Each structure stands twice: as C-alpha cells, then as structure tokens.
Amino acid sequence: MIEFQKGSASSKIKKFLNQVHEEYEQSNGISDKYFEYSITISSENEIVGVLSGYTVFSEVYVENIVIHRNYREKGYGKKLLKFLEDKFENEGYNNINLSTSEFQAPTFYEKCGYKLEFVRKNKINPKLTKYFFVKFFDNPNQYMGVS
C-alpha cells in the first residue's frame, strides 16, 4: 500500500524518518545537526522582516527572506543576511545556500556576494525560473556534519 498525505508529516512518520536517517548517517560517520532558525528585524517594536531556514550537515539553508513592502530597499534584507553570515561563520559550517525566482531577488543576492551556482529555467513561465546561490565561508575550520 502507498499513501499520499498533504501537509506536515505525522509524528509517527517524523520518528521513522529521524531514526532511519540517524542510523544511516552514523554508519557513514556523519551527523546531520539539523535545526531550524529564524531571524527577525524590527523598527519601532514592529517586525519589518524575517529570514528563516535550517542547517543540515555542514550547510546553512535560507528558505525565506521577507521584508514588509513599506521597508524594502532600505537595507533590511542586507542586514538580515549579514547577521546570518556572522552568526554561522565560525560555527563549523562550510556554506550558505539559497534559491530565488526570477520575479524575486536574484540581483540582490549577487550584490550581497552570493555566487550563482546554476539556473533552472521555467519555459512555461520565465518569472518562475529558479536561481540557486551559494556563499562559502573562508574559515577552514569546518567540523559540522562529522560525528
């Protein structure tokens, strides 16, 4: 029997996934060190932006950067990325990964020093062409992901 579920995985499924992943990783001398994070930036006690993501193995992933429309192009996105980079730079991670669509912010990430790794073109709707970026830490002391 095969089942499809929409939405978050049940606790039973999460437990199974964690157990199998952990066993496999340990057999290969790897540890995922997975955790989710969020960073908020405020002005006058109001949240104006959020950067959220997760870490796994030796990498930091950015899932969302959202700035309220009234605060865009005022440097808040750059401040969030800089805070993220400073937070993880000396914590044993190798790099930060993020992706964005054509209609979002590919040039913003390039201006922030992120290198384009590849582009996945959407031939039906070019606005949904996906850009994948990375920024490597210069710190050679990478120890995350090793058990």
Regions found by a protein language model. Name each.
Residues 1-10, 138-147:
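Conserved N-terminal entry element of GNAT/NAT acetyltransferase domains
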Residues 3-63, 103, 120:
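Acetyl-CoA-dependent GNAT
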Residues 17, 109-110, 114:
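Conserved active-site tyrosine of GNAT-family acetyltransferases
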Residues 55-63, 72, 125-129:
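A conserved beta-turn-beta hairpin within the catalytic core of GNAT-like acetyltransferases
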Residues 71, 75-83:
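Conserved acetyl-CoA pyrophosphate-binding loop and the N-cap/start of the following alpha-helix
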Residues 88-102:
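Conserved GNAT acetyl-CoA-binding A-motif
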Residues 97-99, 115-132:
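Conserved catalytic-core motifs of GNAT/GCN5-like acyltransferases
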